[in-house]
Amino acid sequence: MTDRYKVYTKVLKVLKEMLTLSHAGHVLTLAMMIAGIVTGRNAQLSSVSAETATKAKDKSTEMRLRRWVKHTSIEADVVYMPFAKQILEALSALPLSLVMDGSQVGRGCMVLMVSVLYQKRALPLCWIVYKGKKGHTTADRHIEALTKVLPLTPAKAQIVLLGDAEYDTTEMLLWVKQQERWDFVLRTSPQIYVQEGSQSQPINAYPLKKGQVFQRHQVGFTQKATLSLNLVGWWSNRYDGPLYLVTSLDNGYQACKYYRRRFQIETFFSDQKSRGFHIHKSHLSEPVRLSRLLLAACLAYLWMVCQGLLVIAEKNVGLIDRTDRIDKSLFRLGLDWIRYALKLNLDFTPIFRLQFSHSLPDVR
C-alpha cells in the first residue's frame, strides 16, 4: 500500500462516517482532494490529481476533480456546517473571538472569511467568494458573511467580533448590536468624525502619546451619529503609530487585548497560501468553484490543526520538533507528523473534530 493510498483510504473512512452527500461519489472525490492537498501541500487541481492514489491517468483524475468543483448539488456551506458547529461548541466555554478578513484566492477572486481564534490559529467557520481585487467590499457582504455564522453558534455563547478598518461600517455595526451576546472590537480610521456632546471632531484630534491608551464612552459614530459606541485610542510601544478602535466593550484595555488577537487570521491565510496549500495559485476563476475548493482546503487545514493538537497531547512533539520547546505551529506539527508517520509506517486516524484543552501549552 502506497503512502498516498493509505492517506486517501483513511480520510475516506472518516468522511463516510461523518458525511452524507447526495451522491456517494462526492464523498469519495472530497476524500481524494483532502488527501491530495495534504500529501502534496498544494491545492492546485493538477497537483492534487498527481497525488491521488488511483489507477486512472492524472489528467482523468484532474477532470474528475474539476467536475466536482463545478457540481451544483455540492453546497460548501452545508457540507462544512457540522464541522464549524463542532468547533464552536468545543470552544464555547470561553468567549468566542470571531475575526473577519479578506484575501485573494484563485484568479481575480477574493474570499471573505469568518474564523474563530484558538491557540494563535484562526479556524475557518464560513466564507464568501466573489469576483474582485483586494480592497474594501460592501457592508451587505459583511452582513451576509456574519449571517452565515448565526446558525453555527451555541445558544448561550458569548461572541466578540474582531476586524480591521474595512469592517467599521455603520450598517454592519448596527447589525452586530442587534445580536444577543455579541460584542465587537474593530479598528477604525483616524479621519472619521465622532460626536461627544455638542462637539464633533476627527478621531485623531484626541491627544495620544506613545505608550498611552484613552477611551471615550458612548460617542456618536461618524458625523451622522447614527449609533453610539465606545472609542479607544491605543499607541503601543511596539507600534510605530496609534491604533483607533470602536467597541461595545466598556474596558478599553480589554478591547486592546482582544484586538491584538485579530492578526492571527493572517496565519490561516499564510497556511492556505505560501506556507501551506498555495490556494492562491489554484488558477480557478469562478467564485462558486473556488468556494468548493476552499471546502476541501479548510477540511485539510482543520485536520492538520487537530493532528497538531494530538501530537502535543500524546507528547510526541520531540519526535518532529525541538525537545526543549515547541517552535512549530499546530498546523506545521500536523503536516510534519503525517509525513513522519508515513515514513515510519505508524498508524494514524484523520481528525476533523477539535478537542479543546485548558492545559495546552502556548503554541503558534
Each model region followed by its residue ranges:
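Single, function-defining residue in the core of a domain
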Residues: 1-42, 79-81, 91-96, 107, ...
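Short amphipathic alpha-helical segments
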Residues: 31, 45-46, 62
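Short secondary-structure capping/turn segments at boundaries of alpha-helices and beta-strands
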Residues: 32-36, 49-51, 84-87, 99-102
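DNA-recognition alpha helix
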Residues: 45-56
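Major-groove recognition helix of helix-turn-helix-like DNA-binding domains
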Residues: 58-71
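Short, basic alpha-helical nucleic acid-contact segments in DNA-binding proteins
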Residues: 68-83, 87
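An active-site-proximal beta-strand-loop segment
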Residues: 99-111
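Histidine-anchored nucleotide/phosphate-binding helix
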Residues: 114
